[in-house]
């Protein structure tokens, strides 16, 4: 597999085999050192409590802000995953064990999990489910729970891009479903 880097001498784009420690430019003979690969961050998913969008975030995050509806979702680990067949299209759905219902991403039908449930299976990598807090509009009589306190250290914002499965629009064309979110990690 090949990678690319910009020559530090003449600014040309150089191609080189992945894993090479340095690259010699054929034009200016400058040797450009290849930086070490970026550390791989473990990622997890949760469904936004405000708009039901699938969000991806780094595993060490305490909260995840949805870029679609600005809901701050609290992250809590879930150790078991259960399965249920969609009540409409019969697709097998995965959900955190103990959830009262699950919405099918294909047909949008909401299935109660108390029926047709397969026993939970231990998750090989813990996934996360989020609870959320939305600030009510000013002047509203909505009684929301108080927000949780923020971490004491300065969090670092990380932009996260999630590419969901493609769908077909009314004209029969494939549509990409990409969501961009911001997560606050430690």
Swiss-Prot record:
It comes from Oryza sativa subsp. japonica (Rice). Residues 120-157 are annotated as: Disordered. Keywords: Nucleus. One of its GO terms (cellular component) is nucleus. NCBIfam families: LSD1. Residues 4-34 are annotated as: Putative zinc finger 1. Residues 133-143 have a biased composition (Polar residues). Residues 83-113 are annotated as: Putative zinc finger 3. Residues 45-75 are annotated as: Putative zinc finger 2. This is Protein LOL3. It is found in: Nucleus. Pfam families: zf-LSD1 (PF06943). The gene is LOL3. Putative zinc finger that may be involved in programmed cell death and defense response.
């Amino acid at each position: 597999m090949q990678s690319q880097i910009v020559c530090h001498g003449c600014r040309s784009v150089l191609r080189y085999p992945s894993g090479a420690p340095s690259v010699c430019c054929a034009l200016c003979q400058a040797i450009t050192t290849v930086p070490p690969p970026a550390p791989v961050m473990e990622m997890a998913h949760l469904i936004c409590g405000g708009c039901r969008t699938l969000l991806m975030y780094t595993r060490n995050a305490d909260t995840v802000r949805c870029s679609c509806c600005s809901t701050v979702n609290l992250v809590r680990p879930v150790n078991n995953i259960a399965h249920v067949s969609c009540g409409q299209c019969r697709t097998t759905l995965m959900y955190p064990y103990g959830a009262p219902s699950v919405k099918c991403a294909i047909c949008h039908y909401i299935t109660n999990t108390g029926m047709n449930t397969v026993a939970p299976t231990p998750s090989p990598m813990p996934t996360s489910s989020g609870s959320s807090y939305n600030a009510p509009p000013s002047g509203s009589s909505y009684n929301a729970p108080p927000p949780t306190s923020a971490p004491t250290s300065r969090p670092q914002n990380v932009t996260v891009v999630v590419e969901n499965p493609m769908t077909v629009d009314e004209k029969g064309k494939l549509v990409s479903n990409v969501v961009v979110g911001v997560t606050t990690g430690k």
